[in-house]
Amino acid sequence: MTLRSPVEFQDQFDVIVVGAGHAGCEAALATARLGCRTLLLTLNLDRIAWQPCNPAVGGPAKSQLTHEVDALGGEIGKMADRTYLQKRVLNISRGPAVWALRAQTDKREYAAVMKNIVENQPNLSIREGMVTDLVLGDNDEIQGVQTYFGACFGAQSVVITTGTFLGGKIWIGNKSMPAGRAGEFAAVGLTETLNELGFETGRLKTGTPARVDRRSVDYDKLEPQPPDEQVSWFSFDPEVWVEREQMNCYLTRTTAKTHQLIKDNLHLSPIYGGFIDSKGPRYCPSIEDKIVRFADKESHQIFIEPEGRDIPELYIQGFSTGLPENVQLAMLQTLPGLENCVMLRPAYAVEYDFLPATQCYPSLMTKKVAGLFCAGQINGTTGYEEAAAQGLVAGINAARHCQGKSLIIFSREGSYLGTLIDDLCTKDLREPYRMLTSRSEYRLILRSDNADQRLTPLGREIGLIDDRRWDLFQTKQANITAEKERLYSTRIKEQDAVGKEIVDYTQQKIKGSIVLAELLRRPGFHYPDLEKFQLGNEELKPEEKTSVEIEIKYSGYIKRQQTQIEQVSRHSQKRLPPGLNYMAIETLSMEAREKLTQFQPLTIGQAGRIGGVNPADINALLVYLETQLRRSVSP
């Protein structure tokens, strides 16, 4: 139920954040650090920043998001660097645009460290409570929240980060129970309040695999997946880097017996049995989906991953399911190495309410209620990193809203988190959204190594980057610039002793002379090769050397992509008048008129990314705007 002011508030805050998962923690920390008195409300104080599925951070596209959150002053990258069990850089044999750092983290340690951080953050209060109602003012602006038991708290901004808890229901086979995740009750009431206010809500599904006792596994039958010898970092702040002993993950595979067992029991699955019809994540399918969709595959990789240093549970990645418990155990015991495994927790599917993010502006403030923001799985995403990125953006803008400042919109050409939010706000998504490198048109520019170069100046301007971090950033950028200048100006000659050595080493001629930058551009030649011939700079840090090499080696491609961005930006940043009557523009297709009226894009670029709006419609819209402009200035 929606309440109208005046309401007697138990306490008054600037910002209230509903939910203390990965989005909620980032949002609350951001608002508190920006000087807002903040209340973080959660169902369970002992489950702050819990990792209910895979305890891992990073991976393709997700690592770029994590680096970007850190570059802006967020927390998730620091958390992974403090609590990792294993780190690996994925896709290292491919180009730098798709390099992806991934960390397996200690589940309990991660939650404990984050809990300590939010508990000790100035301006931030944490309380248990289930928000069921919103308090609005006379102009439908947010003024506070009410909990299930009637406590009211006032605020100028409210951020909803409810994860899978909103109307959550977990399924194992044909059995279900209300729950946000196993062992924790669902949140009720808030969906009905949002519906009352005219918001559209829907249902999505996700799932998590079983956990098995690591003492019951035969490791001799598993293929070890060791960590990288050279540890890489998510955070650009060396102060949070913790060198620690790493652990192995392991690999096994499904067998013909696994596949047959699943086929024989498909009718018992919540999805295939017809018990639920919510859409699940396309890029993280259940094992049943894999067997059905990829029937020609004889086997699927299954990764066995530790959940902590002192935790007996192993996470069975790639084996999520909603089949009954007895079937799950039989399935697990068909995997090599797990023939005698003990299942400690069964896999389950969870369905929950979400609010399609087309009802939000790119600031993540809702279009219907000023001061109300949404972030994380309520917006239709899946993944801790996607949630953290949205939480940070929502937190920044919630703070700026109550401070009377303009809201920040991140462009898709400037960041992965801008791409993520742009997709959410302009596309009618009906399945859980996962960030992929292929979703960005500008991935060569939006690399992990330059996330600080792209976003830390903005983080400083916003107020989340302190003097120490700013000094570190400026020193790093100065070192990179100076080294590039040195490499472009230092020349070696064909007849020099070092020149002859390089020719012998590379089996490529030097015609007269060559600058070191051109040498670095050659395929197969890298910065460590310069160092072999005493032509490197020993004072540079490893991450600075990496950035220098990438910027030189791929300079042609980078310049070409920058040119493309500039060309696209000429029209894409053109703002659309608020309240524009698209239904009156007869040169637009009827579908375009309906979609533009529904989504109310802010710019031409956003309009062009809405499904059903084609290039001809965009041209017609540009012509219409130009005609209106001429009429307005003509005497």
From Swiss-Prot:
BP-aspect Gene Ontology terms: tRNA methylation; tRNA wobble uridine modification
Name of the protein in its database record: tRNA uridine 5-carboxymethylaminomethyl modification enzyme MnmG
The protein's assembly and partners: Homodimer. Heterotetramer of two MnmE and two MnmG subunits.
Positions of FAD binding: G19, A20, G21, H22, A23, G24
Keyword DNA repair: no
Gene Ontology CC annotations of this record: cytoplasm
First-listed, main subcellular location of the protein, grouped into a coarse class: cytoplasm
Taxonomic superkingdom: Bacteria
Stored Pfam families: GIDA (PF01134), GIDA_C_1st (PF21680), SAM_GIDA_C (PF13932)
Function noted in UniProt: NAD-binding protein involved in the addition of a carboxymethylaminomethyl (cmnm) group at the wobble position (U34) of certain tRNAs, forming tRNA-cmnm(5)s(2)U34.
Record's keyword terms, sorted: Cytoplasm, FAD, Flavoprotein, NAD, tRNA processing
Organism of origin: Synechocystis sp. (strain ATCC 27184 / PCC 6803 / Kazusa)
UniProt: NAD(+) binding residues: 280-294
Record-linked PROSITE patterns: GIDA_1, GIDA_2
Cofactor(s) this protein requires: FAD
Cross-referenced PANTHER family: GLUCOSE INHIBITED DIVISION PROTEIN A, PROTEIN MTO1 HOMOLOG, MITOCHONDRIAL
Compartments, as annotated in UniProt: Cytoplasm
